[in-house]
């Protein structure tokens, strides 16, 4: 169950980062303020909830194992950037993502 909490904390953290990115997207001048307040408010909510879940994780998992698992954020953000904003990702970047996933699998299997 704690591993599910860790993944959910990671996803919420990423959601907060993505909301911040969305807040910077161009909108019409008459809608800009509402747009920014909405997305930054969602970002704060996601990041705040992620922090609360992270505290639960730290109570149950050694920090030397838990913290590297947050590198999952790089994987989630890359996938979201490609899907949501059609951002280009180089083969070198994908290689790095693969190494991160490999590292997470190795660390996770030691517990």
UniProtKB/Swiss-Prot annotation:
Keywords per UniProt: Cell inner membrane, Cell membrane, Lipid A biosynthesis, Lipid biosynthesis, Lipid metabolism, Lipopolysaccharide biosynthesis, Membrane, Transmembrane, Transmembrane helix, Transport
Spans through the membrane: 36-56, 61-81, 88-108
Domain EamA: 40-109
UniProt GO BP: lipid A biosynthetic process; lipopolysaccharide biosynthetic process
Entry's localization field: Cell inner membrane
Primary localisation category: membrane
One GO MF term: carbohydrate derivative transmembrane transporter activity
Stored Gene3D superfamilies: 1.10.3730.20
GO cellular component: plasma membrane
Cysteine-cysteine disulfides: none
Membrane topology (UniProt): Multi-pass membrane protein
InterPro entries: EamA_dom, Flippase_ArnE, Small_drug/metabolite_transptr
Pathways per UniProt: Bacterial outer membrane biogenesis; lipopolysaccharide biosynthesis
NCBIfam families for the chain: PRK15051.1
Family membership: Belongs to the ArnE family.
Function, in words: Translocates 4-amino-4-deoxy-L-arabinose-phosphoundecaprenol (alpha-L-Ara4N-phosphoundecaprenol) from the cytoplasmic to the periplasmic side of the inner membrane.
Quaternary organization: Heterodimer of ArnE and ArnF.
PANTHER family documented for this protein: 4-AMINO-4-DEOXY-L-ARABINOSE-PHOSPHOUNDECAPRENOL FLIPPASE SUBUNIT ARNE-RELATED, SMR FAMILY PROTON-DEPENDENT DRUG EFFLUX TRANSPORTER SUGE
Protein name: Probable 4-amino-4-deoxy-L-arabinose-phosphoundecaprenol flippase subunit ArnE
UniProt source species: Shigella flexneri serotype 5b (strain 8401)
Gene: arnE
């Amino acid at each position: 169950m704690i591993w599910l909490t860790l993944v959910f904390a990671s996803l919420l953290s990423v959601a907060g980062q993505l909301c911040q990115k969305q807040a910077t997207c161009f909108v019409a001048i008459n809608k800009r303020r509402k747009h920014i307040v909405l997305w930054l408010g969602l970002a704060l909510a996601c990041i705040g909830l992620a922090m609360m879940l992270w505290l639960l994780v730290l109570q149950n998992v050694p920090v030397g194992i838990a913290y590297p698992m947050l590198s999952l954020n790089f994987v989630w953000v890359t996938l979201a950037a490609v899907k949501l904003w059609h951002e280009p990702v180089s083969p070198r970047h994908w290689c790095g993502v693969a190494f991160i996933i490999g590292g997470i699998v190795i660390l996770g299997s030691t517990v």
